[in-house]
Amino acid sequence: ILRVVQKDAGILLASLKPEEVLEVLNRCPVSVLKEYPLAILVLMRCMFNWKNIPKMLELKELLLASIREHPKLSEEERGNLLGECDLIQSFLMYNDISRMSQFHRSASEKMTRPAISIRSDGGWTFGSPSVLMMFHRKSGDLDKELEEMNQCMPHYYKITNGHGQGAETIMSAEAHFMRGNFVDAHIALEKAYTQIQGNGQESIALCCDFLAQRLSICMDIKMRNTFEERRKELLQGHNTTWVNIFDSTCAYYYAVTGQTERIP
């Protein structure tokens, strides 16, 4: 099981109930767990996703012990594991861009390879259809937050093989939109679409779609797909998270435009 967890970066775990995973984990001898430090990293991230922070921190201590005691780890791989541990710990600082970036920079300095515990084609937005809604945390600080995103994301991309690429661009586009700068928002939106083309960042593409929907209410723009076409495209990917995000944005659009009978 630990070999599978390590290889598929938590995809299998996401289909299981947290209680089931914890039950198996509690039955696994500590000595066996220590032989699979990459699996421990994946489990740490899953515990964060499941809001089980105490277990996440417990696994972190187990990982550090594994790195110290593992007889066959090279110094390079020890650095990679410690860096990836920093990366996963950064989630605990969500949504403080500066504090998250401190961990990303630390990880970037230690790592010589992309992270294994995070798949580059996995979700980046924790189910949110908006990067701005995720990371704008204080009134009056938006420009500062945008600059922080521009500075920190390259470090994150380096250690995750481009996971979430385009996040800073779509956040900038959303900022223009919220300030009523619709032309600038449209330009930045098209830049974001171009940036993510073909790179598998579906969660960022959905953020782009949500902004395109909102922009279409305020100015005459042509969306890339009809709602029906886009939903059909997402269904072909067999990922219910993407479909649910899209349905939520459609519900928002239809509510704002008074088409309540079309709300999914």
Predicted regions span which residues?
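Internal alpha-solenoid helical repeat scaffolds
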Residues: 31-208
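Short coil/turn residues that cap or connect secondary-structure elements
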Residues: 13-16, 160, 200, 238
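Hydrophobic core/packing positions within alpha-helical solenoid repeats
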Residues: 5-8, 25, 43, 89, ...
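Specific register positions within alpha-helical solenoid repeats of the TPR/Sel1-like families, i.e.
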Residues: 6-13, 48, 94, 136-138, ...
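Long, internal scaffold/assembly segments composed of regular secondary structure
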Residues: 182-264
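Short, well-ordered secondary-structure microsegments
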Residues: 1-48
